[in-house]
Structures are given as C-alpha cells and as structure tokens.
Design a protein with these regions (language model features):
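Short, conserved beta-strand segments of beta-strand-rich sandwich/propeller modules, principally
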Residues: 13-17, 46, 84-86
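Beta-strand-rich extracellular modules
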Residues: 19-21, 52, 90-92
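Short beta-strand segments within Ig-like beta-sandwich modules, predominantly Fibronectin type-III
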Residues: 1-2, 64-69
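Solvent-exposed segments in extracellular or luminal domains encompassing
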Residues: 1-21
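Secretome/extracellular-domain signature
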Residues: 67-180
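Short strand-edge motifs at loop-to-beta-strand transitions and within beta-strands
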Residues: 4-8, 36, 71-75
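Extended extracellular/luminal ectodomain segments enriched in beta-structured repeat modules
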Residues: 41-48, 80-84
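Boundary/junction segments of secreted and surface-exposed precursor proteins
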Residues: 23-34
C-alpha cells in the first residue's frame, strides 16, 4: 500500500473501537493524503485506538535492504459524544532515485538523501495521528511515528530505522570515497 491506516477495529492498521450501550462498532481509516474526520457517536465516552505510522521508502536499486517500519500505538482515549476528531494517516516514504532521494512520506516523513553517484536513500514514512480539540500539531494526542527510509552506498545499503519521534529528519547527502592508488 501507499500508506498506513487508522481504524476503529482490532488487528488492523489504525483502529478505533467505539464502545457504547450497543454492540461496539469498528472503523478503519486508510491513507488518503489528507485529513479525515470522525464524529464520536452519542453515548460514547471512550475509544480504543490502534494507530500505525507508515514505513519508509527503499533506497535506489537495493530491494533487499528493508526500510524501517512505522510505530504502533494502542490506547484508550476519553472523548465526548458529538466531538469531531481529526485523523491523519501517514504516507509511505518514496523510494530513492538515481540522484534524488525518496520523497518524504505524508504527515512528517523526511526526504531521503540524494547522491550524484547514482544511488539515493529512501524517504522516511509519515506519522499517523489523532488530533483532539483542533488541527494544529499541538493537538496531537495519539501518534504512531513513521519509519526511516533505507540507505545506499556504492554497492549495497543499510536498513532504515524503525519509528522515532514526531517528525522524521532529512536524510544525509554523501559521496562515495574510494581508496587512493
């Protein structure tokens, strides 16, 4: 897929469980590249959520070097009936090109490092988050961080780091240094 998911349901990427006086209802939010909303049903005062960040992108021409996976957060959050939650599902980091690093994953991923020598690193995956009481970064209450993009060097690469903080940082741009003769 092209991104992570947020859902109200067990064992899916980003999951919310709305528990009320009736049978619990499950909702899943998939990557769209934009904000989505969820209105808390009447009678519901807490949600069980399962949030995954998106994975990073692959380095150029090194499909066996795996990028980092997004983080996972499971929590129960207090809500108010009728409240509107803002849902942001992170996008997968772009794969590295011959000279240009992979694009940053939607919602906070970092750009992969570029290299003029013909191989560039993958972009970092975007975070998935739930925002309560507004849409600013300071309104984030649950965050599944995105994973790091995989790197490359002259003949191989390094795996991407698994999820970290709120925003990924840009990859480093480097040069290959050969030994002198």
């Amino acid at each position: 897929g092209s991104g992570a998911n947020i859902a109200y349901t067990p064992t899916t990427t980003t999951t919310y469980y709305a528990e009320s006086f009736i049978t619990p209802t499950s909702y899943t939010f998939n990557y769209t590249g934009g904000m989505q909303t969820y209105t808390v049903p009447m009678g519901v005062t807490s949600l069980s959520v399962d949030v995954y960040g998106a994975q990073g992108g692959f380095g150029y021409n090194v499909p066996t070097i795996i990028p980092g996976l997004g983080g996972r957060v499971q929590a129960v959050m207090a809500v108010t009936p009728g409240e509107v939650l803002n849902i942001w599902v992170g996008g997968k980091g772009g794969d590295g090109g011959t000279t240009v690093g992979g694009t940053a994953g939607f919602n906070g991923g970092g750009t992969g490092g570029g290299w003029s020598g013909g191989r560039s690193g993958g972009g970092g995956g975007g975070a998935s988050d739930i925002r309560q009481g507004g849409n600013a970064l300071s309104n984030r209450v649950i965050i599944g961080a995105g994973g790091g993009g995989s790197g490359v060097n002259h003949s191989s690469g390094d795996a991407g780091g698994n999820a970290g903080g709120l925003n990924g940082s840009n990859g480093l741009t480097g040069t290959y240094l050969g030994s002198g003769g």
